[in-house]
Amino acid sequence: MCLMATTVIAGATDVWEGEHAVDWSNTLKIEAAKFADMKVGDKLVVEFKDAAGKVIELHSDGGMLPGTRFAHSIFPDQSNIEVFATPAMLSYLQEHGLEVCGMDFIATKIWYGDGKEGIDDLTAWSGFFWMDEWSTLEITKNSFVGVDWDNISAIRFYSEAGRTDYIINVMTKWGDGGKLGDQTTMTMTDEYAELSLEGIDMEAALADVDRLMIQCNKEGGAPFNFTQVELVAKPSAVQGVSAKTEKADNSIYTISGVKVDNIGQKGLYIVNGKKFVGK
């Protein structure tokens, strides 16, 4: 996949504005209808004050919002957080709405609008995360909701590093048994680091954890942004689904190419050759 440069989507839609004192017992809840016109790739922004040193989490349906960081630690001069809508995130927002959680800060505004291109059904997370000295990006486990790992060959971690001489560790937990790969076992390019899933049971690896962690050390070069976590589908899975959908107008298939009568659960589906996220 070739990631396109960030682009501005004209217009912004205000979702909520006011002053809400957020703490763990006083969540700010936004109804699903407020996100009816939101699109994949749109940027969702939560503005706040008095949050320096605090932690903010974005939830939906009582759990973490897919496609987001596990927690946002707020810097002294920071007045907002922004996330970019993956298909899974959008599905949750439009069905369950948004819950802004955290410890002792004032939420002031929520809106969505200008965003990024290059986000599709295989995008688990997209955004900008600064990698410096042993920085760790933690994305929520349910960012992979609906994924059939039997049809995924690798995970690509895109960045703006423009080089390969940095340290990267991909982990599900700290300590023994949590490391999935590093720069010595992954394919390193100037555009991305790729973790092959050959020999890795991702379903089992994620079963008893709540996040996937990407840790980097810039080494001798400059710090850089991580920009996207993308799944790589096996060619056989894509070809198999395409062949079936060419013959079946509005038939519904799972991402693995199995025909179903209707959509019974959340996940990725294909109708008439086009992928979409079932709610």
Regions found by a protein language model. Give the residues of each.
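C-terminal outer-membrane/trafficking sorting elements
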Residues: 237-279
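Sec-dependent, cleavable N-terminal signal peptides
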Residues: 1-12
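Extracellular ligand-binding interfaces
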Residues: 11-92, 97, 101-233
